[in-house]
Swiss-Prot record:
Catalytic activity: heme b + (2E,6E)-farnesyl diphosphate + H2O = Fe(II)-heme o + diphosphate
Membrane topology per record: Multi-pass membrane protein
Protein family: Belongs to the UbiA prenyltransferase family. Protoheme IX farnesyltransferase subfamily.
Transmembrane segments: 31-51, 52-72, 96-118, 122-144, 151-171, 180-200, 225-245, 247-267, 281-301
Protein's gene: ctaB
Record's keyword terms, sorted: Cell inner membrane, Cell membrane, Heme biosynthesis, Membrane, Transferase, Transmembrane, Transmembrane helix
Localization (cell): Cell inner membrane
Additional remark text: Carbon 2 of the heme B porphyrin ring is defined according to the Fischer nomenclature.
EC class (word): transferase
Record's protein name: Protoheme IX farnesyltransferase
Job of this protein: Converts heme B (protoheme IX) to heme O by substitution of the vinyl group on carbon 2 of heme B porphyrin ring with a hydroxyethyl farnesyl side group.
GO cellular-component term (any): plasma membrane
Length: 305
């Protein structure tokens, strides 16, 4: 473990430079926005009614929980963040937020997210939120990320749980429907993350994070991306076959899945500048957003009232 952690010099911390924007960046707003959206869709698809105010509290708690995990992740990864071009402008690395302050912010934010989820929503949703934060920090960030080539696969559990939390916030249950939502994100995560690793391979090698391209090579990684893309295509159609979404969902999600497979296949003909990997990565974000937008707009049941 110690060989993977390199000392960094953040310089003198100037608290006067810290802004609200820095604290928002500390919570990984791009990741958090997707978490909020998938969590909301999970709530919408639950075949029960909930007061909009309670639904709003649940969404805020999910957002704060995701933000707390992101902040603690940045605290723990501040050494490797300073080595990667993609992460060198994060608040702790830039020296505008002190590392201990970031940790405290993350812990306090996470505590209130879990507490108010339990107080205002239900205990199951609160437990799932707590488990998600714990899993992302302890299982993925601390244990797997710097040790295992399967870091993204196993660690993807935490990123796939927000719709399950949202569903539980309304229904107080875990169902087949919410499990399928989980599977869609869980299977989507590896090809999405490995595409990023393909064009950030040098960064991951430099900070000794064992991402698949750095350990197994690009050809092996592309084969794995294609396998997971095929699995994703199959799983993404399941909401129609269990009656959760209508025929429009089946058609459009099928088309989106075919395009996903096309981009996965195009990786085998990529250029040295990783142009296809970048395109696949960008499309994968669009794909997940649009799939969940479809899940929301073509569902066969209504909930929040």
């Amino acid at each position: 473990m110690s060989s993977l952690v390199r000392p960094i010099n953040l310089g003198k911390i100037n608290h006067s430079q810290s802004t609200v924007k820095d604290y928002i960046l500390l919570m990984k707003p791009r990741v958090m926005s997707l978490v909020i959206f998938t969590g909301f869709v999970g709530m919408w698809l639950a075949p029960y009614s909930v007061h909009p105010f309670i639904a709003g509290i649940a969404v805020v708690c999910i957002a704060l929980g995701a933000g707390s995990a992101g902040a603690i992740n940045m605290w723990y990864d501040r050494d490797i963040d300073s080595l990667m071009k993609r992460t060198q402008k994060r608040p702790i690395v830039r020296g505008v937020i002190e590392s201990d302050e970031a940790l405290s912010f993350g812990l306090i934010t996470g505590f209130f997210a879990v507490f108010f989820m339990a107080l205002c929503v239900n205990l199951l949703a609160s437990f799932l939120l707590l488990f998600t934060i714990f899993y992302y920090i302890c299982i993925y960030t601390i244990w797997l990320k710097r040790r295992s080539i399967q870091n993204i696969v196993i660690g993807g559990v935490s990123g796939a749980l927000p719709p399950v939390i949202g569903y539980a916030a309304v229904s107080n249950t875990i169902s087949l429907e919410s499990s399928i939502l989980f599977l869609i994100i869980f299977i989507w995560t590896p090809p999405h993350s490995w595409a990023l690793a393909l064009f950030c391979n040098d960064d991951y090698k430099n900070c000794k994070v064992p991402m698949m391209p750095a350990v197994k090579g690009t050809l092996y990684t592309k084969k794995q991306i294609l396998i997971y893309s095929i699995l994703l295509f199959i799983v993404s159609l399941m909401p129609f076959f269990i009656g959760m979404n209508n025929f429009i969902y089946l058609i459009i999600s099928g088309i989106l899945g075919v395009v996903f497979l096309y981009y996965a296949g195009s990786l085998f003909y990529d250029t040295p500048d990783n142009k296809q990997a970048k395109r696949f990565f960008a499309y994968s974000i669009f794909y997940l957003f649009f799939i969940f937008l479809l899940l929301y707009s073509t569902n066969t049941i209504s909930t929040i009232s």
